[in-house]
From Swiss-Prot:
UniProt pathway: Metabolic intermediate biosynthesis; acetyl-CoA biosynthesis; acetyl-CoA from acetate: step 2/2
Upper classification of the organism: Bacteria, Pseudomonadati, Pseudomonadota, Alphaproteobacteria, Rhodobacterales
Compartments, as annotated in UniProt: Cytoplasm
Coiled coil: none
Record GO cellular component, one term: cytoplasm
GO molecular function annotation: phosphate acetyltransferase activity
Encoding gene, per UniProt annotation: pta
EC number of the protein: 2.3.1.8
Protein name, UniProt field: Phosphate acetyltransferase
Organism of provenance: Paracoccus denitrificans
Catalyzed chemical reaction(s): acetyl-CoA + phosphate = acetyl phosphate + CoA
Length: 318
């Protein structure tokens, strides 16, 4: 079974409740229909058409709007939030969906078909917040290589390709640990993590490599049982024969399923090269490190993108 098919089957079994806050967008409404038809999730739309089997909330006038606004007011009062402003801001469907997830009314939310990434991520950070023990909220792309003639088949996690611009050593370690956890949840595989660089096992020296080496030490201290190595060039990480020559002492066994890029520039360029030249399917960015799942879509997303992001959001609740 292909990785995405496994994810869909697992999402069906979980039967999670996901809020889609941009129900007025036709793509979101159609995605809700497909999610319900496939049994991938229970769905509530904010705004938009009435869809059989889906919940629907008017974000501007729901019966519990004042209660939600009161929660938001109390959360932000120390930062100058007034009751009037809290009520206005809680009419925003992205914020309101995040608050409903925070309060346990739904298991997760997927937005960004209309709203900007900045607005979607800000709502998740401010309202849902970080998971206990998470050093940083970051993101990953699920990369699927399943086409005919693909040299590598299966699913892989690429992180961070969408959020943290220039992580320091502690942030890079946190990204890697979150990505390893995402691998377990989404791919149902034990993670094998490669910290990518232009150097393999000390083949080059540059001040920037110290950050990766420090991150590796932090990861090993935090998760001594995790299979992880770096710094490592991509070819050495991917190809066991090359790795045996360049890094014969590497503890990695087999092909890594988690690739951690040193910064956002490398990660963003890398996933797009893999997608556009190698034909991999890229799903994301998926946020990781939040207390409860909330995810962002590209404003250029397709109905299929929304369906897949929702299935992955359901998987993040495990």
């Amino acid at each position: 079974m292909k990785p995405l098919d496994r994810i869909h089957e697992a999402a069906k079994a979980l039967d999670r409740h996901i809020i889609l806050p941009e129900g007025e967008d036709p793509r979101v409404a159609e995605a809700a229909r497909r999610l319900l038809a496939a049994g991938l999730a229970r769905v509530t739309l904010m705004g938009g058409p009435e869809i059989p089997g889906a919940g629907r909330i008017d974000p501007a006038g729901g019966p519990d709007l004042a209660e939600l606004a009161d929660h938001w007011h109390r959360m932000r009062a120390a930062r100058g939030m007034t009751a009037e402003r809290a009520l206005t801001e809680m009419r925003d469907p992205i914020r309101q969906a995040a608050m409903r997830v925070r309060l346990g009314q739904a298991d997760g939310t997927v937005g960004g078909a209309v709203a900007t990434t900045a607005d979607t991520v800000r709502a998740a950070l401010q309202i849902i917040g970080k998971a206990p023990g998470a050093g940083i909220v970051s993101s990953f792309f699920l990369m699927l290589s399943c086409g005919p003639g693909a040299p590598v088949r299966g699913g892989m996690i690429f992180a961070d390709c969408g959020l943290v611009i220039q992580p320091d050593a502690r942030e890079l370690a946190a990204i890697a640990l979150s990505a390893a956890d995402s691998c377990r949840r989404i791919l149902a595989e034990e993670p094998r993590v490669a910290l990518l660089s232009f150097s393999t096992a000390g083949s080059a020296e540059h001040p920037s490599l110290g950050r990766i080496r420090e991150a590796l030490a932090l990861i090993r201290a935090a998760a001594p049982g995790l299979e992880v190595d770096g710094e490592m060039q991509f070819d050495a990480a991917l190809d066991e024969a090359i790795r045996a020559r360049k890094a014969p002492e590497s503890p990695l066994t087999g092909r890594p399923n988690v690739f951690v890029f040193p910064d956002l520039a490398d990660g963003n360029i890398g996933y797009k090269i893999a997608e556009r030249l190698a034909g991999l399917t890229a799903i994301g960015p998926i946020l990781q490190g939040l207390a409860k799942p909330a995810n962002d879509l590209s404003r250029a997303c397709s109905v299929k993108d929304i369906v897949n992001a929702t299935a992955i959001t359901a998987m993040q609740t495990k």
